[in-house]
Amino acid sequence: MKFIKYLLILFLILKINYFVESGVDCQKNTEYFVENSCGKNPSKLNINTDIYYFESIGITPYSPPVYNESTTNYFWYLKDGIEYTFSYRYKGCQNIKSHSIVSQGMYYQLLSQPLCPNTYFNYTIYNSGEFGGNTNYYSTPQNIISSNYNGSCTINILITPLSNSKGAFQSSAAKYTYPTCGFNNGTISVDLTKGYSNCHLFSQFDTSFLYEIEPSSPCFYSGLESNYYYLFVDSKECATERLSIQLFNVFTPLEITFENVPDYNQNSIVSLSLSSGDNGILNKTNSFATVGGTGPDPLSTWSHKETKITSTTQFGYFYNKDFSTDPLKVICSFNDGFEPQKFNPNFNFTVTKSDTCLENVTITFYPLPSQTFVVHDYILGNILPLTNNVLSVQYNKFLHISEISSNSERYYSTAFYAPIYRVVETSNGIGCWKTYNITIGEYQIYSNLTMKVYDGDEYEYIFYPIEGVFVNVPANYFYIHYKVKDCEVESIIMIDKYEEITPMDDVKMDISIYELGNCTHETSILVNIDTVFGNFSKVYSSFSNGYFSFYLPNCSCNIGFYYSIPPLIDSETFSYGFISDLDCNSTGTVIQLLGSNGNTIQEVYSNGIKLIVNNDVDTDFAYNIGPGENNVTIKYSNTKGTCYKSQMINIQSPYEVPLVEVTPVIDCDSSDGKISISNYMNFYSLDIIIDSSTIPINSGLVSNLPTGTYTIVYGNSGSCANSIDVYVPSSEQYVEITTSVISHPTCGEQSLNGDGKVNVTLKVLGIKKNTFYIQNQNQISSLTFSDGGVYIAAAPGLNTLSISYGGCIWNRDVNTTISKPTFSFEKIYNDTCLSSVYYKLINNNTNIAINSITSPYTLYSYQNEYYTQMATNLIYPYTVTWNTYCTETFYQEFTFDTPFNYYSNYIQYEIVKADNCNSFKIDIIIKNMNTFQKVTLSSKYPTPINSTHAIFKNLPPSISYDISFTLFDGCSGTEMVGYQQLSNGNTKETIDIIKVNDICNSGKGSIQLSNMDTSNHYYYVKTFSDYYVYTSYPIQPTTNDNGTIISLLSNLPVGSYNITRNCKSITNCYIETKVVIENKDPIIESISVTDSYDKLNNGTAEIKLNYNSTYPINFKIIGTQLSNQNGIFSNLPPKTYEVQVTLTDRMCPITISQSFTINFKTSPTPPPLPQDPSDELSTSSFIQLNILSLLLISIFTIFIL
């Protein structure tokens, strides 16, 4: 019992001593204050006491504490409008102190989240008045910016609806029509059958909603003028909606007829007229037409105005709102524009050629008055001179013809007698492993016939034909070079058989060192590749690792590979020389490294210690070395930094230095560290620098030193002084230091500050110390923390903590691991019309307190919550700062998708082409007008046809039209219409074309044009050229025997041809027809037979082909010995035969066969012979002879019997 009593007394004494020593008053409230926010940032709860004096401290609802580097105290972020409980317990105390905290920052509250995009809702801004009052507001969902009474605080909040697909607009219940200027006939209506009621309409300028506009009938408003309106309407699914409606003035469509538009820089004749809309109120007496500008400049007549049409030309009309002719009245003015940038002006020239290459090609241009033609040699780039619009140019030129005023162009080739060719794939390979035979027709007439290809390294390879056939050439661009007839200049045509993909299944590769390099010479790599084309090898040179490309010769195959260069070896040898005074005993011996050989010294080490360049010496590569033996390692590289090596040399420094012995600090309070120098007698002078003061060292001993690094200055004469640094450590014998990781860092690198927390406990001579200093020696900008024994900026990895108490310093290594936080923006709302998608930053890391977020793009913040809105696909960068010391930039890809798609085909339409170019007009009929609030084309509104159809009439010529529209839900877009329909022309006319395909790749295809109107039109043929551009040339018409104008394009090889007819008087009035000349194999066109008479075997057969080859054709009847080269067979007995026809033509080496039958034909009965005496005698004698023979045969038979 006494023992327990003594223990209890001892416990009370120790407890009393603890509280006396710590000085903690368990009943005292800690000092704190609330820093109220100003809208954007959250409020803060600040404390004036170090957090580590508490056993526990925090707020509920939970928020992590944040370190304030400027005050060295902690704070907590508070969300305004929330009541927090602030609780804490001092160390050594049992009682928990609690306080209720409510910040008074400016914030907002919703009664409920709005239901639909236009729901009219109420929200309250708190603490926005001069004395903390609150203000109620009404709005529709949007990003709301609101300021307090004096504008010193601004709040930025994002209100999103629960649904973006519901509402009066979204369901097409709310509709409106635009008023015609001056008529006040606009309407706004709501379909009450769709669940809507209680409509109220106000002008948007009536901000207090005092003057309601009365409806004509429930929820139908008529007689409205151009204005901005608010329509309020109730429904169950959206509560009260406030619809914002803007009614624009529309105009009676202006119809423009272009009677003559030869070129948009020349005068053209146009006629203008109004449609029959608006009940015929507008007419030519109370409205005035204008051409050529935007201002009122009335014409004397509405038609036949000559003007130059340019990109700024305006056609329009105006009238007074009261339809009077008083010029001082307020007017309605409409203008429509013309878009010549979409047109090509007429471009006419003719070409005259001869059959000899010795004469030039003549090209004659026929420009309009404003046109100027310039011709360039496409290959050489130089301008070719024109004389009176006539160009005389050699054959074998590729011309670029441009027209200056319109910035339009054509290409034309004068290649002479381009060969006909046939391409046949000869392999089953894929990708670039394909091979081809290219057969040149009539190759005998060409000289210097070669084919050139270029590999990826731009080396030229030449193939030569075998009897006009380039055999098994690999996939690539083939350039056929040739001379023909009397041409001295080489012509070139190109055949595109390039294949980009290189399959690697059958490729074997061997890479080896061909020649090992060094720091001045690259290493050479020998690459051997075994492919379907054979074995290839190539040498590459490089200093460093890299990705290489092996382009196989001749073909388009490209084999990539990566190779690592082995460490390069250099034979560099370094020497050194002493620079410092040899008579001055010193550790500051300076050496100069010699023999750099153009290499760059990276680092120099002596006995494992990195040497610093001596900048006080006027020479390169000078370093200080220590006394005695120095094993110096030199690390160097070549000038490109691709070759690294190290070399070691031994340098002996002859100088003597102080021999030092150090006694560590044991008593931290008295700092009893010592430095003793045993050879102090050998120096002329010997001093120590303490706190910037130089103190002589007497008898070689310095005492009462705290832990630290000291500089010993010594010299052997009065003119020479040098120094060494000596570190006095603290004794580890009487200290206990324990470290533990409170929390691992969430950011940082080893040399930078992190946010990890490390607890340090220090006992000296068995006594726990509560106040000491901690630094991290591994960090560049080291922080010092003196309270609580906690280091709060630990970085990932090794943290060498320097713990200072009194005159002692100890180092402890603490390893931490990083636990990086993750942040992400999550989509919270898609608005209806693709204008924005809203995202909110999600922070799921409970140990993270965000200090701030920045981004180069839109970013909203409210109460430490962050939002952004996007209207496109992009990689979104944002920089987050958290837990005071952490900053990192994150990237998130935003993929933009919303219900509305600008590029969908919303408009259903029909293009009505012009009848012809003499009465040119194009109409566009909109077939689903009931799905749009508004449809316009160049500010023009269509003329209604009925409830679903409307028409844009008499449109100017174009290759397409951009129609703008607004849907009932408010979404707007622009759609290009007509491109496909007008790509083959913009009139209803056609060109009569008769096509004859090529046979046997002979280049004998043809295109015949008839019903040609050369008085009003130009005709062109356009085909793909050898230089990836279209070659155009005019078609020359002829007149046939019937007086009809026709044109026959003959001797056409296989290919695509665009036949274009351009109008002479109307710009861009054209017809274009694509004609494809295909290759067809010859066929047996006919077999003519003559049947055979009985037993005479006199049948005949004649076989004819639809192709006359210049090469022999072999005809053979299978199963017989009959064969020839003309296809005519005779003396054929009746039966069925099969003829086989073999063509030896190189352009189509084929065999075809067909059966035919020689039928049996009975001989006809001979006619009666004439009855003259000689005939009778002969007949009688013949009969008598027969009777006698018969009698003899009978007698002989009887005799035998």
From Swiss-Prot:
One of its GO terms (cellular component) is membrane. Glycans are attached at residues 68, 122, 150, 185, 283, 348, 360, 437, 448, 518, 535, 554, 585, 631, 759, 815, 830, 844, 946, 1042, 1058, 1098, 1108. Coiled coil: none annotated. Its main location: membrane. Residues 1-22 form the signal peptide. The chain crosses the membrane at residues 1181-1201. It is a single-pass type I membrane protein. It is found in: Membrane. Keywords: Glycoprotein, Membrane, Signal, Transmembrane, Transmembrane helix. Residues 23-1180 are extracellular. This is Protein dduB. The lineage of its organism: Eukaryota, Amoebozoa, Evosea, Eumycetozoa, Dictyostelia. The gene is dduB.
